[in-house]
Amino acid sequence: LVSVLNAHIENEFRTKEFLKDTISDISHQLKTPLAALNIYNGILQSETENLPDLKEFTILSEQELDRIEVLVQNLLKITRLDAGSIIIEKKIENVSDMMHDIEQHFAYRAKQEQKELILSGDDDITLFCDREWMIEAVSNLVKNAFDHTDAGKHICVEWKQMSDMLQIVVEDNGCGIHSEDIYHIFKRFYRSRFSKDTQGIGLGLPLSKAIVELHGGNMKVESVLGKGSAFMINILGSTKL
């Protein structure tokens, strides 16, 4: 019985390793043609300035190329997380600075979609973390909020220190999450049959959760259908200057 169990475990391990390697190889192979397609599409856009119908098609193709590029990048990140090849380089970082970097990243989208991104938190709170990966985790939550929030609505990013723990909350007053989905949203590639978002690929939230857990934290979600959602990141290692 023990030998059978060991064989089963070994076989499962090999299968997972094969899938990781395959995903990583495919993702790397896609990067070069994607870069070329983006260049070609840029040339087409410049050549169709006086052809509005064709110009619109090049803009749409650019959006789809961007979507594929995000998928490839997220697949690579997930694969690296699974393989344990990511080295978290923690330093003391100012939380407000990180959140303002995120605000700048989404400023154009907020203006284009007529949505408001609001920041709320003390300027002197710090966190022992990997700056790049923590920004990635919060940015994915903010992107998710934008994807599920209509024009005229708002997304709020709030951070606060509670004892030696930092809590970051990304809250929106968008469509909310259906009760059937609430326990599945952190599963990879999960797509809700109730969601109006047809562009999402189902990797952003699982990636954020994995990054937070690598930092020794946890992530929770609260949502009311039709009223909005709040994603909460809780991490130890916070101090106030």
What do the predicted segments below correspond to?
Residues 172:
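Acidic ATP/Mg2+-coordinating residue in the GHKL
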Residues 63-71:
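Short alpha-helical segment of the dimerization/phosphotransfer core of two-component systems
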Residues 152-164:
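Short beta-strand/loop element within the Bergerat-fold HATPase_c
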Residues 89-92, 111, 116-126:
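Conserved catalytic submotifs in the C-terminal HATPase_c
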Residues 145-146:
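Short helix-loop "hinge" at the ATP-lid/N-box region of the Bergerat-fold HATPase_c
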Residues 177-190:
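Short conserved segment of the HATPase_c
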